Amino acid sequence: MTEEIGYPKFLKDTSVNKLKDNIYCGNLTDSWSIGGAVNGGYSMSIAARALSDFLVHKDPLSITGHYLSVAEPGPVELHLEKLSEGKSISNASVKFIQNGEERIRFTASFTDFEKSKGDTLYEREALKFPPLEECIKL
């Protein structure tokens, strides 16, 4: 059996389930841990998945994390609170709870990029990468 890697694994590892209107659950895997502590960006991705389902605006515009204590591999509960909802942006907070203790507090603004109007301006040239076969494999 080959080890699952890449985007499909990330989608699986960041999946959440809705328990109640504003409460979601997930499972932190040790695949995204360093020294027993779960990576903060991985934790933030789980919060973003829950927020995208919870809010009317589905695309993250800004997410901030306040890391209160170390999150560890295992079950997690996410308690979401909508702070405001406008035509183009929703704001919310997430309490990231393990074993009854709040580990992380996220605040976020979400939007809907499909409804954006106007031109998109790219001021930088796209990055150039070597062919995939020349990249380092882990």
Regions found by a protein language model. Give the residues of each.
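Terminal targeting signals and extreme-terminal segments of soluble enzymes
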Residues: M1-L138
